[in-house]
Swiss-Prot record:
Coiled coil: none
Protein keywords: Ribonucleoprotein, Ribosomal protein
Native source organism of the sequence: Desulfotalea psychrophila (strain LSv54 / DSM 12343)
GO-annotated cellular components: cytosolic large ribosomal subunit
Single Gene Ontology MF annotation: structural constituent of ribosome
Entry similarity comment: Belongs to the bacterial ribosomal protein bL27 family.
Region listing for Disordered, in residue ranges: 1-31
Protein name: Large ribosomal subunit protein bL27
Positions of transmembrane segments: none
Lineage summary: Bacteria, Pseudomonadati, Thermodesulfobacteriota, Desulfobulbia, Desulfobulbales
Length: 86
């Protein structure tokens, strides 16, 4: 009789979908009130002027304007939205 030993089973073979985090609006871009600026885990970037922080640390614009990234402190960043100069 022909015999074939059973093959092992692989423990790989799964891959989760990415969570689409990151910067959604970059410096100098015009934004509307409510636009999401950054999706992040924790405050990698802090909210600045006219920027709100959601429950999951999502940063969003509170007014219509232009995005500006700023350094503050020794090694921290914040994002602000300033009214566009008409």
């Amino acid at each position: 009789m022909a015999h074939k030993k059973a093959g092992g089973s692989s423990r790989n073979g799964r891959d989760s979908a990415g969570q689409r985090r990151g910067v959604k609006k970059f410096g100098g871009e015009p934004v509307r009130s409510g636009n999401i600026l950054i999706r992040q885990l924790g405050t990698k970037v802090h909210p600045g002027t006219n920027v709100g922080c959601g429950r999951d640390y999502t940063l969003f614009a509170k007014i219509d304007g232009v995005v500006k990234f700023e350094d503050f402190g020794k090694n921290k960043k914040r994002v602000s939205v300033y009214p566009a100069a008409e």
